């Protein structure tokens, strides 16, 4: 049986993709899980705007109203996945090659459950990280969660793309 998050993914993902968005994560939060938070990113690498979130929210809300998957009253929040976005699909690691990532594992690997390093490659269900002076090979199935890290390099690129008007 599918979780409610998987059921919601099944009914909204294609519409979001058609709109140019990637569905990053669905989670329930708040008291009694009455808030449905949906994180999105753009498929073309553009920044997500408030208008994008509003447009996605309207579409998702309409779909969820028709599908009636959530029994009780809830609030819907649609937001950008952010600069330190979670990596929740194996394909995300290839999309963000060369980027710094923090990874938390389900069990020990070389005596550690946490790693931080640059993504070197991702293939055959394995993620290769450059952590300080060593390479670490992590089986994707061992990853509990992972997030991009906002580094000085990324920040400089972002600030370099900001146009300042006088």
UniProtKB/Swiss-Prot annotation:
Pfam families: DUF150_C, RimP_N. One of its GO terms (cellular component) is cytosol. The keyword Membrane does not apply. Coiled coil: none annotated. One of its GO terms (biological process) is ribosomal small subunit assembly. Keywords: Cytoplasm, Ribosome biogenesis. It comes from the Bacteria. It is found in: Cytoplasm. InterPro entries: Ribosome_maturation_RimP (IPR003728), RimP_C (IPR028998), RimP_C_sf (IPR036847), RimP_N (IPR028989), RimP_N_sf (IPR035956). CDD domains: YlxS_C. Required for maturation of 30S ribosomal subunits. Belongs to the RimP family. NCBIfam families: PRK00092.4-3. PANTHER family: RIBOSOME MATURATION FACTOR RIMP. HAMAP family: RimP. This is Ribosome maturation factor RimP. It comes from Rickettsia akari (strain Hartford). The lineage of its organism: Bacteria, Pseudomonadati, Pseudomonadota, Alphaproteobacteria, Rickettsiales.
